Amino acid sequence: MKRIFVVLLLMPVLAVQAQKKANPSNFAKTITVDDLKKHLYTIASKEMEGRGTPSPGLDRAAAYIENHFRSLGLTAGNKGSFLQTYPLYKDSATNASLSVNETAYEINKDYQPSTLFNYTANMRFSEAVFAGFGIVDSAMDDYKDLDVTGKLVVILDGAPADYKSSVTGLRSPAYWYTKYGVAQKKGAAAIILVSKDFPRKTPLTTSQYKMHSYQKTLQPNLFTVSAAVVENILGEEGKNIFDKMKTSSVSKKTYTADIELGYSKVTSIAHASNVIGVLEGTDLKDEYVFITGHYDHLGKRDTVIYYGADDDGSGTTSVLELASAFAKAKAAGKGPRRSIVFMTVSGEEKGLWGSEYYTDHPVFPLNKTTVDLNIDMVGRIDGTRKQGDSTNYVYVVGDDKVSSDLKVISEAINKKYAKVELDYKFNDPKDPQRIYFRSDHYNFAKHGVPIIFYYDGMLDADYHKPTDTPDKINYELMVKRDRLIFHTAWEMANRNDMLKRDIPLEAPKGF
């Protein structure tokens, strides 16, 4: 009995010693071009139909990922299931109406209601507050001296010709979604957004999926309208309003008008899933390293498939191949000390839905999750990158945002093993693309989990186009990037201590 007890006591120590002697390069080399191609040509195939959230193609991709995890002997990550399923709510418009001063307007010709925000309501206003372009930032405030609480707000799409913002793209203060958020925070009951794009070439999309929970308040209803509608609301000042606003000649104030907004809808429920496979660790098995990528893309639009090979078939394929490499290490008796969670999430293209759901409903404690290594677009070359070796680089984002340990370790591991050029262009807080906030790692970071986001920088050419296909992937470069991630994950899984969490969270601006 005594000898058996001593042996049992020594087992964790021996496991650690064996791990220290393991050469991770032997297992990193099992990540190959052929394996990556095999997976990516499946994930980004016609059969997957662009993997929209939700869709049958997305479900087929989830089944493929689950089957791969099963074949490796991974443990189901969600209480006996490889799937963590979350609800989606589909709002379908059944009726809409808009009238101003007893003039009824025609849908698509003069207005379109939002199916993303609107709730069933018949709203009547006797006045409206015009707030210019509805922009609020350090340089201008279109709401200055205006009280819009409980009122209808009218704002123009776009921005003044001389407007410049430090933030571009989807989070610019001039973007309609940001303007909507500003009006909501200021208490608007409803919003009219004036657009030049009428009559609409594309009819109203009557259905819109979204992920939501119960809310304390209703979001303001949003109607996008033509210039003819705003002219009826503002009177003489509303004529040729976009031309007049070039000289700021339209007063930002309350205007009297009889306005009725009608909207009704029905809501149905669908579901999407994250796919989670776990490689159990040894003496530190109750601590976790996450390796993530999103397996959804934009789906089909009519008959056109958006294949999403780089975005993010490349990340999904990387997760699958990294899982294979670590499974081979464990089979050889060189398994990790910490458990490694391989998770492919859905709904990223819709607003980071899957990762948000996971971090709000974690299967494994977030305070025991030492790091998330997120892989989103690692298969292409950034054609705008002018310095360095374009065939041996990766953009690294977020390694200095939560933990002061992580960047030092990441660079040391790269120098020792992978020797890939680490480019921090998109890690700059002044980066106008705000990349740090735009992929699934951010949902981990905002819960205090250290993260690294690996990215190729390919924001032009085929980004979010049907031409993002697997034949355009640079598989040799993808292997280099994945081997770097493997070595980094190996270190994260086997070092003695979890990463420190000593840097305050950077809050997004312009959201």
Q: Which residues does each PLM region occupy?
A:
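Short helix-loop-beta-strand segments that form the rim/entrance of peptidase-like active sites
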Residues: 324-351, 375
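Soluble metallo-hydrolase cores and metallopeptidase-like ectodomains found primarily
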Residues: 20-24, 109-145, 216-308, 324, ...
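N-terminal hydrophobic or amphipathic helices/low-complexity stretches enriched
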Residues: 18-77, 98, 204, 280, ...
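His/Asp/Glu-rich mid-to-C-terminal helical/loop segments that flank catalytic regions of hydrolases
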Residues: 317, 324, 456-511
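Bacterial Sec-dependent N-terminal signal peptides
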Residues: 1-22
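Noncatalytic luminal/extracellular "stalk/propeptide" segments of secretory-pathway proteins
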Residues: 49-164, 409
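Metal-dependent peptidase/peptidase-like ectodomains
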Residues: 106-107, 220-239, 345-447, 451
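Extracellular/luminal Protease-associated
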Residues: 109-221, 306, 324
